[in-house]
């Protein structure tokens, strides 16, 4: 995909960072914030939307309710209580969570509010047993200065229940995650490129981790993106868990929106209107035409008692196959997403991609004839139960009509390849109302004083401190930019000075680059692996010189444990090392006498090649020098 000119495109990106806070108990009860697989009970709920304080029903809540799904909740033994089950009022807000959030607000120069009011945000996708999420703004404004990106708001809120499984009619959640304290940091729409979006997310994430008061690991931090271009509308993208995906998500979303606007132009260029398309929209049951089909999807659908509907989309030939993201998504994919989300059907085909999937040209022509369609029309085929098909027809019609508006207001979900899919309509202002069970909390001086003690150190201060620890200026800059900065701090506190900070920093930065250059899959290396290596150096089990070789072997091998590779590289006993050095010296006496003092490098190279990282370079050098002295003299 060729790079777009983001300035001409009018790209605007805002971020919402959601980070779990590492407190002993949840935001509104005393349950543990650990995750727990064991459970003994379940409860079942059907949720429906309530009126907001404006007396209106939120469009996103209405959308979820129309799915008619049943929600099943697993009740863990030690990580949930009657509060999570919505059978007991919430307790007072977690004071430690407030202190951590206020400290982060101070670091971002935000304006802290005088009084905290907990609100209910209507959410009825089943992720909250109550049908709402409790949230409270604690600060407004602020700035990420080096990126010139404004902070709009900072809030504390309760995390959602953890999704275990989802079917067509039922979703299963665990209540262990529900109520874990989150901080939500929302930036202004000031980000202007995919790369800047990643940098901003990285810097905010580092700031959060440097408090030492946030959880780490998969699922503990999530990024949402708000993306728009000139002539379009803001699109929300939910659930980005991998930082490195952010640039691709921004690029793909920008080009998707650009092409949706191009489709809008094309529709009007063809002289089409919503009324014209609607009045010529034809639907027929064409099941009989596919009774002998070779298409497995259609055949399986019919065998299960399903029907096949054919739809004529007036003068839309080429539009359904229009690439929104080259080689990844077409306009037809967008329609299929809507049908999947709203009607629960997956079997959708359109004429811009046919013949294919076992559907023949002859079958297409029969459908075209049955629908009285011309070659300028697009054909759509859907398979399923009659009730779902009828719902799907309305969904397809509505999504085609939305194309005349360009970019519909949507909430989309992030996918692993950097693309996104439709989740639901965007929520509006009709989704908030006050929490009546929790009184306001005044921000007093003691709370502010306690928060000040948690404010993380500035990057400039870190730089000076790291140089004092022995890091070069370049290495100090690199570790400050690294997502594992907080791991570096933790390992230095645990294992320094026996393991020099420069060794820890180099392992996290330069060594991983080296491993990648050798074809290693560095995604296999987690924070626990890095600590295991540093701990092994601390315990004198391995030499710092063996780290690269250990990690290369670990990341290029299958079905091996890191601890087994570490065992292979354990430091040689001094007697064995001395024997290796003596043998190599005795085998190279003529060359040593010829080179004299310069022979040190020759022997050093041969010894290190022989021991393969199982000896400390400094010790090897000392032993070689003492022995060569006798030989040369």
From Swiss-Prot:
Enzyme class: ligase
Presence of keyword Hydrolase: no
Domain of life: Archaea
Any one Gene Ontology BP term: glutaminyl-tRNAGln biosynthesis via transamidation
Residue segments, region Disordered: 415-437
Cellular component terms (Gene Ontology): cytoplasm
Pfam families (alphabetical): GAD, GatB_N, GatB_Yqey
GO molecular function, one term: ATP binding
Assembly, per entry: Heterodimer of GatD and GatE.
Similarity remark: Belongs to the GatB/GatE family. GatE subfamily.
Classification via PANTHER family: GLUTAMYL-TRNA GLN AMIDOTRANSFERASE SUBUNIT B MITOCHONDRIAL AND PROKARYOTIC PET112-RELATED, GLUTAMYL-TRNA(GLN) AMIDOTRANSFERASE SUBUNIT E
Job description of the protein: Allows the formation of correctly charged Gln-tRNA(Gln) through the transamidation of misacylated Glu-tRNA(Gln) in organisms which lack glutaminyl-tRNA synthetase. The reaction takes place in the presence of glutamine and ATP through an activated gamma-phospho-Glu-tRNA(Gln). The GatDE system is specific for glutamate and does not act on aspartate.
Protein name listed in UniProt: Glutamyl-tRNA(Gln) amidotransferase subunit E
Species in which this protein is naturally found: Saccharolobus solfataricus (strain ATCC 35092 / DSM 1617 / JCM 11322 / P2) (Sulfolobus solfataricus)
């Amino acid at each position: 995909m060729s790079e777009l000119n983001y300035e001409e495109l009018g790209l605007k990106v805002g971020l919402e960072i959601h980070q779990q806070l590492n407190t002993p108990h949840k935001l509104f009860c005393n349950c543990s914030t650990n995750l727990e697989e064991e459970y003994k009970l379940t409860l079942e709920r059907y949720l429906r939307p309530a009126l907001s304080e404006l007396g209106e029903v939120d469009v996103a809540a209405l959308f979820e309710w129309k799915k008619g799904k049943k929600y099943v909740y697993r009740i863990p033994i030690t990580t949930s209580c009657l509060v999570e089950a919505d059978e007991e009022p919430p307790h007072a807000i977690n004071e430690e969570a407030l202190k951590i959030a206020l400290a982060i607000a101070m670091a971002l120069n935000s304006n802290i509010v005088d009084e905290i009011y907990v609100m209910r945000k209507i959410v009825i996708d089943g992720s909250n047993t109550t049908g709402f999420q409790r949230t409270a703004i604690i600060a407004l404004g602020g700035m990420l200065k080096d990126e010139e990106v404004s902070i709009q708001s900072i809030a504390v809120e309760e995390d959602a229940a953890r999704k275990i499984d989802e079917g067509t009619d039922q979703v299963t959640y665990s209540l262990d995650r529900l109520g874990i304290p989150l901080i939500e940091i929302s930036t202004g729409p000031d980000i202007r490129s995919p790369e800047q979006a990643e940098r901003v997310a990285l810097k905010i994430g580092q700031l959060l981790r440097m408090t030492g008061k946030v959880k780490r690991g998969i699922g503990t931090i999530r990024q949402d993106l708000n993306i728009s271009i000139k002539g379009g509308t803001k699109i929300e993208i939910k659930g980005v868990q991998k930082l490195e995906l952010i640039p691709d998500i921004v690029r793909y979303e920008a080009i998707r929106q650009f092409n949706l606007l191009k489709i809008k132009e094309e529709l009007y260029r063809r002289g089409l209107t919503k009324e014209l398309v609607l009045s010529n929209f034809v639907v027929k049951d064409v099941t009989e035409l596919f009774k002998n089909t070779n298409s497995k999807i259609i055949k399986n659908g019919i065998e299960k008692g399903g029907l096949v509907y054919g739809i004529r989309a007036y003068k839309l030939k080429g539009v359904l196959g229009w690439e929104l993201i080259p080689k990844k998504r077409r306009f037809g994919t967008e329609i299929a997403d809507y049908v999947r989300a709203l009607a629960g059907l997956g079997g959708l085909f359109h004429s811009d991609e046919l013949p294919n999937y076992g559907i023949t040209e002859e079958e297409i022509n029969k459908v075209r004839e049955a629908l009285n369609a011309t070659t300028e029309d697009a054909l759509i085929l859907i398979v399923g139960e009659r009730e779902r098909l009828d719902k799907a027809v309305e969904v397809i019609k509505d999504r085609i009509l939305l194309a005349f508006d360009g970019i519909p207001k949507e909430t989309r979900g992030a996918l692993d390849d950097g693309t996104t899919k439709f989740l639901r309509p965007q929520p509006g202002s009709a989704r908030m109302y006050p929490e009546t069970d929790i009184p306001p909390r005044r921000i007093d001086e003691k709370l502010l004083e306690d928060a000040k003690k948690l404010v993380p150190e500035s990057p400039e201060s870190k730089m000076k401190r790291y140089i004092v620890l022995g890091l070069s200026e370049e290495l100090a800059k690199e570790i400050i930019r690294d997502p594992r900065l907080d791991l570096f701090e933790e390992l230095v506190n645990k294992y320094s000075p026996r393991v020099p900070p420069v060794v820890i920093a180099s392992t996290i930065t330069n060594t991983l680059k080296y491993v990648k250059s050798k074809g290693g899959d560095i995604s296999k290396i987690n924070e626990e692996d890095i600590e295991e290596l540093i701990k092994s150096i601390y315990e004198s089990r391995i030499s710092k010189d063996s780290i690269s070789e250990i990690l290369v072997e670990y990341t290029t091998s299958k079905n091996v444990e890191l601890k087994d590779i570490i065992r292979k590289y354990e430091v040689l006993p001094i007697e064995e090392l001395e024997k290796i050095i003596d043998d190599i010296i005795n085998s190279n006496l003529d060359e040593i006498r010829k080179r004299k003092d310069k022979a040190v490098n020759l022997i050093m190279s041969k010894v290190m090649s022989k021991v393969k990282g199982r000896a400390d370079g400094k010790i090897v050098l000392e032993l070689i020098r003492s022995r060569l002295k006798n030989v040369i003299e």
